[in-house]
């Protein structure tokens, strides 16, 4: 018996998350671990992750199977949020209209700026000496 599933990819900074959304009871697994364990029981990360589902009232209707790579925990959380919103949009276009005003479908393109030669960091210059 095959169940219906919706997949999408989200990215943030160096993090990438593949999100698989299946009808179920609201179980979240990240890299084959429970979501609470993976995100260290941090309620801020878990509420950010569930944001698109909470906006539509679907938090207990779907199971999430997530593969997250790269970056840190915060970047992965935001990548999952974007991937989840995109997966929900593949279900139906009217759900897209309700997610868009909340900003769940917007990719946060900010990333670390590269270091330039002659500088200590991306923009920090060595101390200036007049004489």
Curated annotation (Swiss-Prot):
**GO annotation, cellular component aspect:** chloroplast; cytosolic small ribosomal subunit
> Which terms does the UniProt entry file under GO BP?
translation
Q: In terms of one coarse class, where is the protein primarily found?
A: plastid
Assigned keywords, A-Z: Chloroplast, Plastid, Ribonucleoprotein, Ribosomal protein
Question: Is Ribosomal protein among the key words of this record?
Answer: yes
Keyword Plastid found: yes
Alphabetical list of PANTHER family matching this protein: RIBOSOMAL PROTEIN S9, SMALL RIBOSOMAL SUBUNIT PROTEIN US9M
Family of the protein in this entry: Belongs to the universal ribosomal protein uS9 family.
| UniProt cross-references to HAMAP family, sorted A to Z | Ribosomal_uS9_B
Q: What is this protein called?
A: Small ribosomal subunit protein uS9c
Source organism of this protein record: Emiliania huxleyi
